Amino acid sequence: MENEEWKVSVWICQEEKLVSGLTRRTTCADVVRVLLADHNEKQAEEGSMLMGEEGSMLLGPPQCYCIVEKWRGFERILPNKTKILRLWTAWGEEQDNVKFVLVRSEASLPNIGPRSAEAKVVLSKESPCHQRTLSKTSTGPTQDKQRRVVRKAFRKLAKINRKRHETLPKESSSVEKMETLVHLVLSQDHTIRQQVQRIMELDREIERFEARTHFDRMKMHGVNYVQETYLVGTVSEKGSASDSNPPSDQSSQEELFADYAQKCDEVLLLQEQISRQEEAMEQMTVQIQEELNKRWMERRQEELSSKEQESSLSDSGADQGGDESQLLLEQEQVKTELSASLYIGLRLNTDLEAIKADLDYTQKMWDDKEQELQSLLHSLNDLETSGCQDLAEISCEDTSLGVTTTGSPTDSWVEKDLGRPTNCEANDEDSDTGLSSMHSQDSDSGPVCESLV
């Protein structure tokens, strides 16, 4: 136990006394005996002659006295066998409102109820022996009632303490639940943000993979591999044409495709740079606006201060050329405003020139890349037309061999020579018009047959 639990204050003759050294077995009778002995010793040591009023209060054996418990206007008599330390600890937080008073048993009220004043000692005029007999006869039947009251009070105090201990865990549990909910919401928010970021990263990876596979298929099957896969009738012809293409054309096409992919990447980088430049321009405009607002506020404050100075100067020196001083102040104010506006204008002009230079540079780079892309596209179209010409020549050779089996070899070579310029002219026309490879093949087949006939 703590030191506070070992001490109990008891009021005796309107004087508070602390009774220390209490144990669990200490009863109210023990406390009464100790208080009477201490009081009588003090009275004997002082040797006072005024024993009539105060000294007569504590005359008699300890059985004639009892301890009354008072709490918020209520009081009750504690039996002699009551464990005072247990009762004191059972009060708990209400110990500040509890007070123990030592009185004579005859002076205390037998019933328990609210009292406005403290118990006063009433001196009896009869003999002490008669008082003892009366006290024995009067207190005999009320001891059981007092015990029941004390037990009931202990039960009530136990219930109060139990309820208090139950409410505290409930409050703590509700607070813990709220904290767990808050932590759960925060963790879910964090996981959702991570999942959104991961989804964006996966989308970018998917786009890159699709672009890579597209370029790989273009390298392997050609630019029009989609048309070749869906046009079933020309699949065999395309396969034979791809087998007849020389390896040099394939290598050149692969190089062109690689250049094309590189240029596309550079274009994307340029677009990113342009977006960054636009963001920088927006930031610069915001900074310029803030600077203008700041300068305007400073100028406004200067104007207000100058007006105050002018008013003070006009009040002090109204008789000594007030008009001239006002003119001078206005001139200085105009000069400061002009210098500030000039500085701001120069600053804005330099910033705008720098931004224009950056924009011109990016536009120039964009035009160069676009020209390179156009040239690459033209070269790809030329390669397609040349491949179609090779296919047409191979088909012409096959047909000439099949038709002129009875003729001489010189005639077949002559027919081939006659058929070649017509094919070149037709291919030139198709390349000039910019038609696709499929249309160029259709246009090549007609003149070859006419020359053979």
From Swiss-Prot:
Residues 299-310 have a biased composition (Basic and acidic residues). GO terms for biological process: nervous system development; positive regulation of neural precursor cell proliferation; positive regulation of neurogenesis; signal transduction. Residues 402-411, 433-444 have a biased composition (Polar residues). Residues 262-295 form a coiled coil. Its main location: cytoplasm. Keywords: Coiled coil, Cytoplasm, Cytoskeleton, Neurogenesis. SMART domains: RA (SM00314). Residues 1-107 form the Ras-associating domain. Residues 299-322, 402-453 are annotated as: Disordered. One of its GO terms (cellular component) is spindle pole. It comes from the Eukaryota. CDD domains: RA_RASSF10. It is found in: Cytoplasm, Cytosol; Cytoplasm, Cytoskeleton, Microtubule organizing center, Centrosome; Cytoplasm, Cytoskeleton, Spindle pole. InterPro entries: N-RASSF, RA_dom, RASSF10_RA, RASSF8/10_RA, Ubiquitin-like_domsf. PROSITE patterns: RA. May play role in regulating embryonic neurogenesis. This is Ras association domain-containing protein 10. It comes from Xenopus laevis (African clawed frog). The gene is rassf10.
